Regions:
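Intrinsically disordered, low-complexity protein-interaction/activation regions
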Residues: 1-183
């Protein structure tokens, strides 16, 4: 057995946990820090497909990373919270496109080349997807940046609104100019 293996064998669980915490803290200290979230139009010739916009984390070492969302509703909700940092209000969703016209419009702008194209869904499906999307957003952002630095937390009720802060304090938000009309 090597000296390193012997030293590991002699360590208690507490010592191992302490060393691991120390190494993880050092890694975190040296890791590039996010400085901005950007919603960027893809530079593509054919936009007849889906997923026309990317959500990108820009870091202080001049690198960038695309956030991978589990589904399109998660991306929609996250971009919506960037455009509306106070979150969205859950209303009676008898007719989602009428109750949430800005969400339907933003959905078409992000995912469809034809902004007039209709979205087929029922009110129940829409409500369910929006609820699940909030959870998926938290998971994607946690994986990318880490929850302890975010204020996204659990949705909180504030004067009847479900408030989902977009990003932690000090992070710049850059939105593609074509989506600015959705603010």
């Amino acid at each position: 057995m090597s000296k390193i293996q012997e030293a590991i064998q002699q360590m208690s669980v507490e010592e191992m946990q302490e060393r691991l915490a120390k190494y993880m803290a050092t890694d975190k200290e040296w890791a590039p820090k996010p400085v901005a979230i950007e919603v960027r139009h893809r530079d593509i010739k054919d936009i007849s497909g889906t997923n026309i916009y990317d959500v990108i984390v820009l870091k202080d070492d001049d690198t960038e990373e695309v956030i991978k969302f589990e589904d399109r509703y998660s991306k929609l909700i996250y971009i919506y919270t960037l455009l509306h940092p106070k979150g969205y209000q859950r209303r009676s969703l008898n007719k989602p496109e009428k109750a949430f016209p800005e969400l339907a419009s933003l959905y078409r702008a992000i995912f469809m080349a034809d902004p007039e194209r209709l979205i087929a869904y029922t009110a129940k499906d829409f409500d369910h997807m929006m609820s699940m999307a909030v959870s998926f957003v938290r998971k994607a952002i946690d994986k990318m940046i880490g929850c302890e630095e975010l204020t996204i937390g659990n949705p909180r009720q504030y004067y009847g609104r479900t408030v989902i802060p977009a990003v932690y304090n000090g992070l710049e938000i850059i939105i593609d100019s074509q989506l600015q009309s959705h603010i």
